[in-house]
A protein has these predicted regions:
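Class I S-adenosyl-L-methionine-dependent methyltransferase catalytic core
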Residues: 1-199
Length: 199
């Protein structure tokens, strides 16, 4: 989203890795990822092997973009905003605005009812006036959202790593990062790296 940051990143990577073909894209990630997928499936791109680092702005990444990549010869590292994104949209009482619910649907690739069934439960309390129902958010929704996203990745990629957990200086979980691939060895290496950094 920030042109200056993208230019600086491009400059830094070219200086650090002058022999590598590294491309920094500062555009709508969904458009670019679908274009990349189409190219990798084309005659010009089908013999290429790509490693993509996906660091979406907020929750702008759409599930359809991940599905498109799963068909190509690509390994992806994806930063999933479980604490800073998904969890913040999930209101404790289950009253999520239509806008936020639509964003969750597009991000997770799930319908509204499925999302609600994962993250909320109906509890009944006995009162003087009989039973009353109320909706409550599941405990540890951040971990739950990471598990759901990991399972979603497994539904389209053959292999998915354990998550690397990124926390704030206060120890709050902000992100879970996964590697997804159709290459078993790539994910085995990713898991070895993740294990080292999660300790």
């Amino acid at each position: 989203k920030n042109k200056k940051n993208a230019e600086q990143l491009s400059k830094n990577t070219k200086e650090a890795y002058p022999s590598k073909d590294i491309q920094i894209q500062n555009d709508d990630c969904n458009t670019k990822l679908i274009e990349l997928s189409k190219f990798l499936l084309s005659p010009e791109g089908r013999n290429l092997k790509v490693l993509a680092y996906i660091d979406p702005y907020g929750m702008q990444l759409e599930w359809k973009s991940i599905v498109s990549l799963s068909r190509a010869s690509i390994d992806i590292w994806i930063l999933v905003p479980t604490g800073l994104g998904v969890n913040r949209l999930l209101k404790r009482n289950g009253e999520i605005t239509e806008t936020w619910l639509t964003r969750l649907e597009m991000f997770l690739g799930l319908d509204a009812e499925t999302i609600k069934s994962f993250f909320y439960k109906i509890e009944k309390d006995l009162t003087l006036f009989g039973e009353e129902e109320h909706t409550t958010k599941e405990k540890d929704a951040i971990k739950l959202s990471a598990n759901i996203y990991q399972e979603r990745l497994k539904s389209v990629f053959s292999f998915v790593s354990h998550p690397y957990i990124l926390k704030s200086t206060q120890g709050n979980i902000m992100y879970h990062m996964f590697m997804a691939s159709n290459n078993k060895t790539a994910v085995k290496i990713a898991n070895d790296i993740i294990k080292t950094y999660n300790e």
